[in-house]
Amino acid sequence: MAFNFIRAAAAGAAMALCGVGSVHAAVNLPALKIDKTQTTVSGLSSGGFMAVQLHVAYSATFAKGAGVVAGGPFYCAEGSIVNATGRCMASPAGIPTSTLVSTTNTWASQGVIDPVANLQNSKVYLFSGTLDSVVKTGVMDALRTYYNSFVPAANVVYKKDIAAEHAMVTDDYGNACSTKGAPYISDCNFDLAGAMLQHLYGTLNARNNATLPTGNYIEFNQSEFITNHGMATTGWAYVPQACQAGGTATCKLHVVLHGCKQNIGDVQQQYVRNTGYNRWADTNNIVMLYPQTSTAATNSCWDWWGYDSANYSKKSGPQMAAIKAMVDRVSSGTGGTTPPDPVALPAPTGVSTSGATASSMAIGWAAVMGAASYNVYRNANKVNALPVTATSYTDTGLAASTTYSWTVRAADANGAEGATSAAASGTTLAASGGGTATCTTASNYAHTLAGRAYAAGGYTYALGSNQNMGLWNVFVTNTLKQTSTNYYVIGTCP
């Protein structure tokens, strides 16, 4: 079908009104009346890999099934960016499927993922475009082989006969089918969301082709469940009217995971509103949950190779656990109740600086009642890689004879930050001279490979000083100065 300009114009108008977020403040994710046996997940690209991770690691939750578009086998990258961009995308002949099956069984026996027996009755829908130049069809072939070890062949549908590039496929919205590019949604005259949902759930009512109620879209506070780790502060949901507060319907739940460069910050609400899921949700009482990565995450991708955590594919993976917590919350109601908004923590008081050296400064503050941790900001940029549980922090890697300003925010047990403190300033001491530092200029990715830096939450941090170097990728370049063993600061050599 040709691009639907009327629908595109309407969608554009809606997004113009809403902007990147909503005209309303984000609310807490509601607790709804959900049949927990009817919980499924699907995703595209990095979201496809994440959908597989959730389906396998949390198989007790997602036993009903999963839909995967341009994804790959569980733990395909084995914690390596080289594997991720190589065998798991471009060169699928190198995928060690039998090893990945063995790892799955081992982890299940250790309890770090759910028992694989939960997958025995799952439904799985797989899709690969014949023109996909990002995740080759051979990767999806390997995924089918992987699933053959756990899911009956009769329960798997694999569609790979549409000349589509790397995109979420629809029947009336997006780029031409053979186009690769933002928003990575393509009109291929095929309702992929509908095909997946009908395979996962069986016969469904006809979709709603009319304009969907604006009030059914909810922007929720994602920071209740996770802070940083490559995830945004808010997520989205589509809640049919019968499933909302006060409704009597018992509803299904489907988790939708966007691909790289497809979050709200990248493509506004196009993936949330125009991929076809909500039309089916509206007439079949299916709540659609759209978790969001942040633009700070590597390429806005989900963590399917370990850019944020070595445990990325286990139940303990930060992004995995956050999405599971969202599912648990939205499934915990008996009739659409919404938890009260939390009381924001007050700003820390008594923020001060002390103990200046040529390259460091100690920052202290008074404890805040109810705070689980604190975050320290220098000149409005967060400097601590991990939550600070004490009431002091030493900021390192500073330039000599330079004045800086620090503020502090308290965070609750969910990582939600309170108000910002008053600023405290301090000036580092003059350099004492002596010695010759070694400087290296390279991409953030190269710095991490060489051990001069590390990646966390989609950002790169200098080893030792923990200075924030920006996004973890091959495009951002920094010069790191080694001032002592395993200690690097951002700077230049004289």
UniProtKB/Swiss-Prot annotation:
PROSITE patterns, per this entry? FN3 (PS50853)
Q: Taxonomically, which superkingdom? A: Bacteria
Q: How does activity depend on temperature?
A: Is stable at temperatures below 37 degrees Celsius. The stability of the enzyme decreases sharply at temperatures over 40 degrees Celsius.
> What are the Fibronectin type-III domain coordinates in residue numbering?
347-431
The region annotated as signal peptide is 1-25
Induction (UniProt):
Induced upon growth on poly(3-hydroxybutyrate) or poly(3-hydroxybutyrate-co-3-hydroxyvalerate) as the sole carbon source.
Keyword DNA damage assigned: no
pH-activity dependence text: Optimum pH is 9. Is stable for pH values from 6.0 to 10.0.
State one molecular function term (GO): hydrolase activity
Q: Which UniProt keywords apply?
A: Hydrolase, Secreted, Signal
Assigned EC number: 3.1.1.75
Does the keyword field hold Lipid biosynthesis? no
Task: List locations, semicolon-separated.
Answer: Secreted
Name the InterPro entries for this protein: AB_hydrolase_fold, Esterase_phb, FN3_dom, FN3_sf, Ig-like_fold
Q: What is the reaction catalyzed?
A: [(3R)-hydroxybutanoate](n) + H2O = [(3R)-hydroxybutanoate](n-2) + (3R)-hydroxybutanoate dimer + H(+); [(3R)-hydroxybutanoate](n) + H2O = [(3R)-hydroxybutanoate](n-1) + (R)-3-hydroxybutanoate + H(+); (3R)-hydroxybutanoate dimer + H2O = 2 (R)-3-hydroxybutanoate + H(+)
Q: Which residues form the active site?
A: S45 (nucleophile), D132 (charge relay system), H166 (charge relay system)
Function of the protein: Catalyzes the hydrolysis of poly(3-hydroxybutyrate) (PHB) film, producing the monomer and dimer of 3-hydroxybutyrate (3HB), while the 3HB trimer and tetramer are not formed.
The family note in this entry says: Belongs to the AB hydrolase superfamily. Lipase family.
Additional facts recorded: Poly(3-hydroxybutyrate) (PHB), a homopolymer of (R)-3-hydroxybutyrate, is a storage material produced by some bacteria, that is used as sources of carbon and energy.
Q: What is this protein called?
A: Poly(3-hydroxybutyrate) depolymerase
Q: Which organism is it from?
A: Delftia acidovorans (Pseudomonas acidovorans)
